[in-house]
């Protein structure tokens, strides 16, 4: 799922006139109340109430939801095809720093792309449900334990170097995907290397 932090910030400013957006969302998008929402420490209603208290008069909970949805761009068609192909050969799991406001939007984007989350992924691990954020070792260790395979039989891919470093520190093999590069080539090379070992 591709993200657009700046569009999300713009939506918070335009729809809500919310002045603290730069304090809670950045390239890692997990600070302050946003981080608490994604870690499951704040409910969606609590988050919306806090945001609305700092927004223009007349702003609504739906305005908050709409502004939040602007962080999500969608899934590139080649990535959709890649996920379909990989799911035929491997068990796929999603590890996502996510929240109960954005999840319905992102799940809808997967559905529209023809790859519903429950069909393409064996299981999804969402930070707000796990009460832990990537790159915390707690997050990765819980995932490893729940999947039940030796960690060396797994491969974690992320577009955040911090998340990759956190996974490696927790004993999970991981590779960094630089947004805008060819994910398919990176994955195929990594999987080929694993088969040789």
Language model features by range: what are they?
Residues 32-36, 102-104:
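A short acidic, helix-capping loop that chelates divalent metal ions and anchors anionic groups
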Residues 34-65:
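A metal-dependent, Asp-based hydrolase signature
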Residues 7-11, 32, 46, 50, ...:
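Alpha-helical elements of Rossmann-like donor-binding domains used by nucleotide-donor carbohydrate transfer enzymes
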Residues 1-29, 53-54, 169-170:
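Active-site neighborhood of HAD-like aspartate-dependent phosphohydrolases
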């Amino acid at each position: 799922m591709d993200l657009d932090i700046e569009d999300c910030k713009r939506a918070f400013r335009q729809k809500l006139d919310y002045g603290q957006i730069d304090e809670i969302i950045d390239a890692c998008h997990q600070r302050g109340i946003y981080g608490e929402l994604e870690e499951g420490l704040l409910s969606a209603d609590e988050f919306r109430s806090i945001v609305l208290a700092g927004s223009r008069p007349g702003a609504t909970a739906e305005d908050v939801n709409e502004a939040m949805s602007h962080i999500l761009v969608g899934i590139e068609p080649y990535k959709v095809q890649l996920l379909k192909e990989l799911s035929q050969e491997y068990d796929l799991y999603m590890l996502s720093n996510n929240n109960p406001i954005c999840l319905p939007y992102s799940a809808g984007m997967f559905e529209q792309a023809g790859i519903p989350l429950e069909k393409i992924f064996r299981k999804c691990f969402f930070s707000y449900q796990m009460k832990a954020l990537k790159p915390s070792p707690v997050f990765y260790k819980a995932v490893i334990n729940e999947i039940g395979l030796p960690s060396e039989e797994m491969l974690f891919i992320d577009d955040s170097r911090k998340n990759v470093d956190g996974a490696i520190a927790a004993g999970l093999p991981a590779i960094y995907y630089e947004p805008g590069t060819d994910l398919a080539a990176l994955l195929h090379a990594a999987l080929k290397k694993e088969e040789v070992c």
